[in-house]
């Protein structure tokens, strides 16, 4: 760039004019901002939010205490204590999930052979204390009961990719 070009750019402020033109161009385009608490954007069927434990249609919990989710969790956020039953099967006596450790990777959901643990569509679960983010089995089952219709739809929509 020659001396004359640099001088012309400095005095004519061409970069400034280009920036102002860009600003004016976007000023009159429609806004893309979502007013969050009042408007919510669409979520993918693969969105990974708050965890839930699902039940079978007859009301029995799905978790067979195989501990695959506990083994695969990279953050070690899941703790399961199995309890044997009279018929030889087993269920989880204790199923604890530390949401402060969870990294929402979805590996627990992928590892579960019976689709017991799933990550649902809820992303609004702020709490006032840290202790409220330690989910036990009853809290996870309550989440599953509350979101069952949505969870079943998401699992069915994602089935071709599993």
Swiss-Prot record:
GO BP of this protein: aerobic respiration
What the entry lists under Pfam families is as follows:
Fer4_7
Entry membrane topology: Peripheral membrane protein
Q: Which reaction does it catalyse?
A: a quinone + NADH + 5 H(+)(in) = a quinol + NAD(+) + 4 H(+)(out)
Specify the superkingdom.
Bacteria
Residues involved in [4Fe-4S] cluster 2 binding: 73, 102, 105, 108
Work out whether the entry's keyword set contains Iron-sulfur.
yes
Q: Where is the 4Fe-4S ferredoxin-type domain?
A: 53-83, 93-122
GO terms for cellular component? plasma membrane
Q: What does this protein do?
A: NDH-1 shuttles electrons from NADH, via FMN and iron-sulfur (Fe-S) centers, to quinones in the respiratory chain. The immediate electron acceptor for the enzyme in this species is believed to be ubiquinone. Couples the redox reaction to proton translocation (for every two electrons transferred, four hydrogen ions are translocated across the cytoplasmic membrane), and thus conserves the redox energy in a proton gradient.
Q: How does it assemble?
A: NDH-1 is composed of 14 different subunits. Subunits NuoA, H, J, K, L, M, N constitute the membrane sector of the complex.
Family affiliation: Belongs to the complex I 23 kDa subunit family.
Protein name, entry field = NADH-quinone oxidoreductase subunit I
List the taxonomic lineage. Bacteria, Pseudomonadati, Pseudomonadota, Alphaproteobacteria, Rhodospirillales
User: Gene behind this chain?
Assistant: nuoI
């Amino acid at each position: 760039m020659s001396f004359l070009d640099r001088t012309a750019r400095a005095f004519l402020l061409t970069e400034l004019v280009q920036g102002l033109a860009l600003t004016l161009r976007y000023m009159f385009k429609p806004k893309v901002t979502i007013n969050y608490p009042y408007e919510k954007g669409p979520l993918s069927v693969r969105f990974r939010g708050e965890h839930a434990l699902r039940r079978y249609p007859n009301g029995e919990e799905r978790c067979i205490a195989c501990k695959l989710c506990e083994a695969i969790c990279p953050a070690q956020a899941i703790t399961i204590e199995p309890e044997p039953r009279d018929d030889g099967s087993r269920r989880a006596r204790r199923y604890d999930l530390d949401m402060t450790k969870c990294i929402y990777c979805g590996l627990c959901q992928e590892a579960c052979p019976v689709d017991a643990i799933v990550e649902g569509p809820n992303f609004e679960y702020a709490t006032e204390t840290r202790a409220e983010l330690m989910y036990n089995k009853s809290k996870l089952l309550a989440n599953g009961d509350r979101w069952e219709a949505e969870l079943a739809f998401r699992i069915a929509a994602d089935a071709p990719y599993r």
